[in-house]
Amino acid sequence: MMALASMVANAQETLATWTATLNTTETVSDLQRGAPMTIDNEGNAIVTGTYTKDVAFASSYLEPIATSAFVAKYDKAGSKKWAAGLKGAATVKAVANDAEGNIYVAGNFADIVQILDGTGEQKATINGKEGVTRQVSAFIVKYSKDGDYVASKVIIPEQARNDEGYGDPDPEFIPYKLIASNGKVYLAASYQGNSKINDLTLEGKYQSLWGLYLYDVPTLAVVSL
């Protein structure tokens, strides 16, 4: 069974100017529902999602490892421009663009992920939390408007306490929203455990249940990257 993702661009309230369909997964269960997208200042559409099969998009060609993630660009007329990949166990949770057309994607990953540019060429490798197969580590990747890889950051959450009765620690850092404005990029996220971004350390919060069981409290943060 093939899974399809569809996009519609509107110039007016009820009139679609173009539509596009991407076939990126073999099954519906591998398809990312509610995948983030954005529109840049020139009217180009930046879309994201998951892929579990080879994807040909304009001159880009992406091959997956596990359930990989992609970011792709359509121009304002709906023509395919390029697609870049996060090859490995990865999910894009947020996307934004700045005034120059640069594109920022943030999300979660596990193990080893290869960052591919808009030609499908590997440009960098990121490593998640060691020994953890769940997507608890986070990435932020910057691409140029032409799909060139510019830079990346990795956030690896760490267990902050190990009290008796703590149970199985489960630190994580989950991006929710990216905003690029006035030359800066802001990230909204939730986290458990300690996470370090540049020189900023986000400290985990904990509560005790009847004084016997200590557990992580999910905490929200907005940080400037």
How would you describe each model-predicted region?
Residues 1-6:
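Bacterial N-terminal signal peptides
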Residues 11-225:
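A sequence-level/structural motif corresponding to short, flexible coil/turn segments enriched
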